[in-house]
């Protein structure tokens, strides 16, 4: 019996040391991310966020660190086509994933993405700090609307402002755009121009 208890204590101690090691020191993990069309391999601590992996390890500085708490949206990127807050996303959970930043939305020959062009045409930024996150969020939001995903303000009617169109797409009224972009803050207050830029692209 004492021998058995000794083994149990040893097992508990091993689990404890692993847990403490993870909490205080983390564990290194090798992963590959396809960032803006380019495969990038790196070794990171398991606690490293996708934002820190991109900025600090891969020198991809398009996504910005604003609040670092998932409240401002400046860090938004597209992860396998879906918009995510990279400051709340663990890099190790997405080994092999496709990551697209605002810088990667332009074509290989340098032609701007329609959203990038629209933000320029409508002065959808002032200081520009939130702009990469705004553009990535808008790109993800347009894809969600095209797939028919409703928002909190989507009308129950089959058509009309904010409602669904005949092909199942969500008609993006200004209210829809504001609701769907509400997770991205602009401290300069360029919201009117941001909505105008997205409205132009959504109408095409």
List each language-model region with its residue ranges.
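Signature of N-terminal electron-transfer/Fe-S-associated modules in redox systems
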Residues: 17, 21-204
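Ala/Thr-enriched low-complexity intrinsically disordered regions
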Residues: 10-13, 19
């Amino acid at each position: 019996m004492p021998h058995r208890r000794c083994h149990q204590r040893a097992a508990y101690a091993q689990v404890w040391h692993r847990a403490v090691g993870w909490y205080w020191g983390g564990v290194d993990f090798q992963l590959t991310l396809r960032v803006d069309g380019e495969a990038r391999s790196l070794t990171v601590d398991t606690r490293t966020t996708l934002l820190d992996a991109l900025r600090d390890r891969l020198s991809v500085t398009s996504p910005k660190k604003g609040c670092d708490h998932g409240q401002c949206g400046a860090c938004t990127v597209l992860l396998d086509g879906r918009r995510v807050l990279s400051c709340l996303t663990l890099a190790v959970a997405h080994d092999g994933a496709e990551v697209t930043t605002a810088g990667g939305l332009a074509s290989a020959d340098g032609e701007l993405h329609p959203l990038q062009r629209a933000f320029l045409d409508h002065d959808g930024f002032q200081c520009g700090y939130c702009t990469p996150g705004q553009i990535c969020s808008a790109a993800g939001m347009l894809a969600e609307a095209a797939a028919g995903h409703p928002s909190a303000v989507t009308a129950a009617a089959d058509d009309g402002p904010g409602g669904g169109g005949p092909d199942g797409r969500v008609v993006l009224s200004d209210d829809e755009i504001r609701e769907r972009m509400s997770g991205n803050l602009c401290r300069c207050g360029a919201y009117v121009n941001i909505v105008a830029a997205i409205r132009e692209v959504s109408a095409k």
